[in-house]
A protein has these predicted regions:
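Acetyl-CoA-dependent GNAT
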Residues: 44-105
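Conserved acetyl-CoA-binding loop-helix of GNAT-fold acetyltransferases
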Residues: 109-123, 146-150
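C-terminal "cap" of GNAT-fold acetyltransferases
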Residues: 131-134, 138-140, 150-179
Length: 179
């Protein structure tokens, strides 16, 4: 099992995913509050530094919520975004994927969101033994949907302008329905 006291570092050819730290909060808050990014979050209001810090303190206490900072290692050589696995149900071996954003404007359009998604899903399946990863995305967020489809997510259902997508060996569970 993964823990915040011994967080993993996940690497691919050009990316490193490392755990979010308190030092990252100003950067991630600035990314999250960009109009072009926050419009895709279900809670799309501007977040204050105090709200972000309070969220982080609560996050630190959870053993089923892991935020990773995406670092590009070759060209930009800096943090460029974030991605998360959360609502992890260790018993059912499933988790929610999300909070994906490429906040650094120079890093957009380079395929980093797709690569980060792919390596985090592979880590979740291989190292954590998760059999199902699911997410929710606005049906009109076509760039995100393209990333998710390229990483083997499929649409389980659509409701109220939101797609529910799943991937993994137990993607639709025994009942064949999205929970």
């Amino acid at each position: 099992m993964i823990s915040k006291t011994t967080p993993p570092v996940i690497e691919s050819g050009r990316l490193r995913l490392r755990s979010l730290t308190v030092a990252d909060l100003p950067m991630t808050l600035a990314w999250r509050n960009q109009d072009a990014i926050r419009k895709w979050f279900f809670h799309s209001e501007i977040i204050s530094p105090e709200q972000h810090r309070a969220w982080f303190e609560s996050y630190q206490e959870k053993d089923n919520d892991f935020v990773f900072v995406i670092e590009e290692k070759r060209v930009l050589q800096r943090a460029v975004g974030q991605v998360s696995l959360y609502n992890i149900d260790w018993e059912k071996k499933r988790a929610e994927f999300g909070r994906l954003m490429i906040g650094d404007s120079e890093a957009r359009g380079l395929g980093l969101a797709q690569e980060a998604t792919r390596i985090l899903i592979e880590f979740a399946e291989r190292e954590l033994g998760l059999r199902e990863i699911y997410l929710e995305v606005y049906a009109d967020n076509l760039p995100a949907i393209a990333v998710y489809r390229a990483c083997d997510f499929s649409i389980a259902k659509t409701q109220g302008g939101v797609l529910y997508m799943v991937c993994g060996s137990d993607a639709l569970g025994a009942s064949g329905e999205f929970e």
